[in-house]
């Protein structure tokens, strides 16, 4: 886990250090020559090996070994452990195998971790031998529970507001259900959960819903003719204020006025400079929509740009948007999320040995993770890069999990208090 933690915080770590734990028969072991291999070290190996960059073959080998080892032990009811006595260890391992790192969201992971964290109810040999009170600590657990429930209360308050917005903006008239709104807000809250980031969460959810409202409006046969739709998209791409032309094109259509009002309110929640930046982001999206690329990748690009703008990462420094690192991240995120959207629509995500079978997609995801996590002097701010990773992971999450699993996560993160 030390390798994983260091990599996640930007340190240059050679994963070949794991070769010291690889035996001649290709298996990995905490100590060579053991009669019984414990589950917890192999589970930690599995968690660490998922965070890999292109070309790190030792981590790919470790992932396959650890995944198959743990699956076999669970199937045969042979989970054995000599380092810790924990009632929930097997539950934690089962969850980790079902929900790999790419398919986790921060608050989902936290909710389950708190569920399985037993505090002093767990017995660690290392804690007893070396007097490490910070391990399995009841005080830490109490603090974590209070923090989680405080954030959850804030999220519930915001969800009430989002439902009011849904009604006042007549979102249902565009064929968008309240459950879709809940999913959009959940993805935001499970990713950027801190209480002080309300504006970013709300903007995340609204951006996803408003973009769907626009696409729904343009796809309705009884709203505009094909020629009018084409003209409208061109106007949007060149001048976001061209949205007013909806009224002149189709004054008698009630949806047009509703859409116009909702879109303008979305942009007017910010100061003039931020609004200008948001208009530019939407203009790019409208151009993609005109070119028939308005799903998946373009949505991810719009969302990432919007979040970076709203968080103030680009304030008074629009040159960042044309920085080589930013454009590379944006292009790669767009390409990956476009593919993930296609996978989600067709339900064709195939998993083998804990990894997806689409090797090209997997390599692109590894490249994105490397660009985000590795420090490169003179590059863009780490928070900006992290935004692209956060957006990508929500797309992977939606492609990976079934609706029933997502519903369970929504309830656990937003509505079930931790005790």
From Swiss-Prot:
Family recorded in the similarity comment: Belongs to the terpene synthase family. Tpsc subfamily.
A GO term, aspect molecular function: magnesium ion binding
Tissues and organs where the protein is expressed, per its UniProt entry: Ubiquitous expression in roots, stems, leaves and flowers.
UniProt name for this protein: Copalyl diphosphate synthase 2, chloroplastic
EC category name: isomerase
Entry cofactors: Mg(2+)
PANTHER family found in the cross-reference section: COPAL-8-OL DIPHOSPHATE HYDRATASE, CHLOROPLASTIC (PTHR31739:SF30), ENT-COPALYL DIPHOSPHATE SYNTHASE, CHLOROPLASTIC (PTHR31739)
């Amino acid at each position: 886990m030390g390798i994983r933690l260091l990599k996640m915080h930007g340190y240059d770590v050679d994963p070949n250090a794991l070769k010291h734990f690889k035996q001649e028969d290709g298996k990995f072991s905490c100590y060579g020559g053991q009669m019984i291999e414990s589950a917890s070290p192999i589970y930690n190996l599995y968690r660490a090996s998922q965070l890999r960059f292109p070309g790190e073959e030792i981590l790919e080998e470790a992932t396959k070994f650890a995944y198959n080892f743990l699956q076999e032990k669970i199937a045969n009811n042979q989970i054995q452990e000599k380092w810790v006595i924990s009632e929930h260890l097997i539950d934690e391992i089962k969850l980790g195998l079902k929900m790999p790192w790419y398919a986790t969201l921060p608050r989902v992971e936290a909710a389950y971790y708190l569920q399985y964290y037993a505090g002093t109810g767990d017995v660690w040999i290392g804690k007893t031998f070396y007097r490490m009170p910070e391990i399995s600590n009841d005080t830490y657990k109490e603090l974590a529970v209070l923090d989680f429930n405080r954030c959850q209360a804030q999220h519930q308050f915001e969800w009430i507001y989002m439902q009011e917005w849904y009604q006042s903006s007549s979102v249902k008239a565009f064929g968008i259900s309240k459950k879709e709104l809940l999913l959009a807000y959940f993805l935001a809250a499970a990713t950027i959960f801190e209480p002080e980031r309300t504006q970013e969460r709300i903007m995340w959810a609204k951006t996803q819903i408003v973009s769907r409202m626009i696409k729904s409006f343009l796809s309705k046969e009884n709203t505009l003719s094909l020629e009018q739709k084409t003209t409208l998209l061109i106007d949007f791409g060149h001048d976001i204020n061209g949205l007013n032309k909806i009224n002149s094109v189709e004054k008698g259509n009630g949806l047009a006025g509703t859409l116009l009002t909702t879109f303008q309110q979305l942009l007017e929640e910010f100061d003039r400079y931020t609004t200008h930046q948001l208009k530019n982001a939407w203009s790019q999206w409208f151009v993609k929509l005109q070119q028939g690329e308005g799903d998946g990748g373009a949505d991810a690009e719009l969302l990432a740009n919007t979040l970076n703008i709203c968080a103030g990462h680009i304030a008074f420094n629009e040159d960042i948007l044309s920085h080589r690192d930013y454009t590379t991240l944006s292009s790669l995120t767009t390409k990956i999320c476009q593919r993930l959207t296609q996978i989600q629509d067709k339900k064709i995500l195939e998993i083998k040995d804990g990894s997806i079978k689409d090797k090209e997609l997997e390599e692109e995801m590894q490249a994105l993770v490397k660009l985000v996590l590795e420090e490169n002097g003179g590059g863009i701010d780490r928070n900006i890069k992290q935004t692209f990773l956060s957006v990508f992971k929500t797309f992977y999450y939606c492609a990976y999990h079934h609706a029933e699993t997502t519903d369970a996560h929504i309830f656990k993160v937003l509505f079930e208090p931790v005790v």
